[in-house]
A protein has these predicted regions:
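Active-site nucleophile elbow and catalytic-triad environment of alpha/beta-hydrolase enzymes
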Residues: 154-173
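Gly/Ala-rich beta-loop-alpha elbow adjacent to hydrolase catalytic centers
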Residues: 74-79, 83
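Glycine-rich His-Gly loop
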Residues: 7-10, 77, 101, 185
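Active-site loop/oxyanion-hole signature of alpha/beta-hydrolase fold enzymes
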Residues: 30, 36-71, 87-88, 113-115
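Conserved loop-alpha-helix segment in the C-terminal half of the alpha/beta-hydrolase fold
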Residues: 186-220, 232-233
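Conserved HGGG/HGGXW glycine-rich cap/lid loop of the alpha/beta-hydrolase fold
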Residues: 2-43, 89-92
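Flexible "cap/lid" loop of the alpha/beta hydrolase fold
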Residues: 89-93, 97-136, 163-164, 191-197
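Catalytic His-Asp charge-relay segment
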Residues: 177-184, 208
Length: 237
């Protein structure tokens, strides 16, 4: 049995990983899917003070208070920024798993890892236009057309604190000595894969590489597939 802590991406919440957690539990694994401060069912805590450190501390505190050991720490998308920093705060992480996720080095910000044209159109301009300069609405509402209605509605109404994308990651070099895997979701339209370059870098680093023929939100589009890959990685890391 492995212990997974799975951290969701921007505009999301732990709710979107529940099907994956259930599938892992059926295989005997212990799985936590926390929701980061200001998002999902914790959206009532949304404030200007929330930054990347806040979210990393959310995860570190979960690991401490649950007395979790030998944790397989999984980050999806923006969640990779969070898990990398959280792993720098605690000693209980056994291995890192990035699911179509950002993989920062010390001092890097998420906006440093995205094409500048996407930073402006996806984050900065929407925050100026409709987020009082500090909140980012969900930038891809048209991409939700194939999702279940309740899932699409949760994303469409979500807002994410901009500071989490512009704060630098405080990364202990020790984190990069941990066994690490990168799961690349390869079913995205041409020209819209923000993570293809990061997948190549992960391969060059000698990390374990897995591919799933899914869109970016594999936890919604293919929960059984991602659960199977995570289950397999648990025996290899």
């Amino acid at each position: 049995m492995a212990t997974f802590v799975i951290v969701h991406g921007a505009w999301g919440g732990g709710w979107e990983w529940r099907s994956v957690a259930d599938a892992l539990a059926a295989r005997g694994h212990r799985t936590f899917t926390p929701t980061l401060t200001g998002l999902g069912e914790r959206s009532h805590l949304l404030s200007r003070s929330i930054g990347l450190h806040t979210h990393a501390e959310d995860v570190a505190q979960l690991i401490r208070w649950e007395r979790a050991q030998d944790v397989l720490l999984v980050g999806h998308s923006y969640g990779g920024m969070v898990t990398t920093m959280a792993a720098s705060m605690v000693e209980e992480v056994k291995a890192m798993i990035y699911v179509d996720a950002f993989t920062p080095e010390p001092g890097q910000r998420e906006i440093d890892l995205i094409d500048p044209k996407w930073v402006e159109s996806m984050l900065l301009e929407p925050a100026r236009r409709s987020g009082d300069g500090w909140l980012v609405p969900f930038p891809f509402p048209d991409d939700l057309d194939g999702f279940p209605a309740d899932v699409a509605e949760r994303y469409r109404t979500a807002r994410h604190p901009l500071a989490t994308f512009t704060d630098p990651a405080d990364v202990d070099p020790r984190v990069r000595t941990l066994p690490t895997a990168f799961i690349h979701c390869t079913g995205k339209p041409p020209g819209e894969d923000l993570f293809a370059g990061l997948a190549r870098e992960a391969d060059q680093r000698g990390w374990l590489i897995e591919e799933i023929a899914s869109g970016h939100d594999v936890q919604i589009e293919g929960p059984a597939a991602i659960a199977e890959v995570l289950h397999d990685l648990a025996s290899r890391m």
